[in-house]
Amino acid sequence: MSTENHSNYLQNKDLDNFSKTGYSNSRLSGNFFTTPQPELSFDAMTIVGNLNKTNAKKLSDFMSTEPQIRLWDILQTKFKAKALQEKVYIEYDKVKADSWDRRNMRVEFNPNKLTHEEMLWLKQNIIDYMEDDGFTRLDLAFDFEDDLSDYYAMTDKAVKKTIFYGRNGKPETKYFGVRDSDRFIRIYNKKQERKDNADVEVMSEHLWRVEIELKRDMVDYWNDCFDDLHILKPDWTTPEKVKEQAMVYLLLNEEGTWGKLERHAKYKYKQLIKEISPIDLTELMKSTLKENEKQLQKQIDFWQREFRFWK
């Protein structure tokens, strides 16, 4: 199938949402959710694979003359490149891969920033040269048109939690885990980030992102990767005992207090905080993921397989 036919196939199969799922007006059952379903997408991908000697030569020859590629650090057994207006990073290093016993080529990109034609170009001209290829990073992004600074986020697991506050004293960024871990969760004010970076103006009143960065073995669990996460609106006045009210209020407003509790007390108050919250946005995230799981799987299949398009 030619590139033109591939492109037509994408358009004719109603795949305008190939990169991003759209907003939906549906709600979970009950009256708790006034927040629209988030927009869901894969926001970053890393694909690794092996170039054999023949394909390494073919790809190197192609890249050295292709105007859409900027190539540097070129030797017989390695090169680095950026493609498609710097939107794609490509690296090949056979010596390093052999010494570290890992695959020798890596391609990094954000699929949301690529057009259908650019996806096809990247797939046909770069990724299809690789053998034994697979994902080593997937970022799952949920964009909410709601102010998530008013919510309390926590995990059932014992992971490091870091919070950065904005000028108004409200949380602006929350991290769960560490950057090099197999799963790293970011919750941040996307509208403020775009404003700070002089990026595209966001027209909606609020735009917050919950981003789940998955690496290595965790990429296989992209459709079941945040069961332990909770984004809540707990009412600290709900518990009958004043002592429990006071402790919940302290835990919600002074994060350092968690570190002073013994394990059984942490478990008790995490359970209590979940019980006194009528809302858990992660339930909305799960339903959104379930609705869009097939479409997201098609994207993964597109990058990993030869051109056998789904029906």
Curated annotation (Swiss-Prot):
Superkingdom of this protein's organism: Bacteria
Any Gene Ontology biological process: DNA replication
Keywords, sorted A to Z: DNA replication, Plasmid
One Pfam family this sequence matches: Rep_trans
InterPro entries, per the entry: REP-like_C (IPR003491), RepD-like_N (IPR054456)
Job description of the protein: This protein is probably a specific topoisomerase involved in initiating replication. This protein is specifically required and may be rate-limiting for replication of the plasmid in vivo.
Misc. remarks from the entry: The nicking site of REP proteins is sequence, but not plasmid, specific.
Family: Belongs to the plasmid replication initiation factor family.
Protein name, as recorded: Replication initiation protein
Organism per entry: Staphylococcus aureus
Gene name of the record: repD
